[in-house]
């Protein structure tokens, strides 16, 4: 069976070609602190700037120490100004005809609603949340809502029965 592979088309690719990839790779090896500092500054919104890119301790590696960010903000909010109506999330059910596309604005609205429900239930920064849901679009809302309010989340395989989970 022959298979044709077609690279995704983009109007503004991050890496133009294989030569640029090799240059970036080489730079990441030769000047890792400068390389990752530049990437972090350009691609992540920070609530508090980091003190050090990498501590170079092999046994206790830490990246962007002292920095503070919010994953939910970086995944959604920072795209609202210029891309609110663009597709942020595509979900497809077991039946391919069952699918949803959400814009950044729609995703933002749903995640904020979910975060507010969690807060009303007493979830706050540092809380631990176990997400036991099927593979539905709301599972993504739950994960992003937890990161939005600073709660730690763990996703449990939805195929386990409630009875089997109580002993785990």
Segments (PLM) and residue ranges:
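N-lobe entry segment of adenylate-forming
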Residues: 1-102, 106-109, 113
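Anion (oxyanion) recognition and catalysis
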Residues: 147
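Structured binding elements
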Residues: 150
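C-terminal catalytic core of Y-nucleophile DNA break-rejoin enzymes
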Residues: 158
């Amino acid at each position: 069976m022959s298979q044709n592979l077609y690279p995704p088309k983009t109007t503004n690719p991050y890496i133009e070609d294989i030569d640029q990839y090799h240059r970036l790779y080489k730079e990441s090896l030769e000047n890792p602190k400068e390389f990752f500092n530049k990437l972090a500054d350009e691609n992540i919104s920070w609530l508090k700037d980091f003190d050090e890119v990498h501590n170079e301790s092999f046994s206790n590696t830490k990246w962007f120490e002292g920095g503070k960010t919010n994953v939910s903000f970086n995944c959604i909010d920072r795209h609202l100004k210029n891309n609110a109506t663009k597709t942020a999330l595509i979900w497809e059910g077991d039946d391919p005809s069952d699918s949803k596309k959400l814009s950044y604005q729609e995703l933002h609205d749903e995640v904020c609603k979910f975060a507010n429900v969690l807060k009303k239930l007493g979830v706050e920064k540092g809380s631990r949340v176990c997400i036991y849901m099927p593979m539905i679009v709301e599972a993504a809302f739950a994960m992003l809502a937890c990161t939005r309010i600073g709660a730690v989340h763990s996703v449990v395989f939805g195929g386990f029965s409630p009875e089997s989970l109580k002993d785990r």
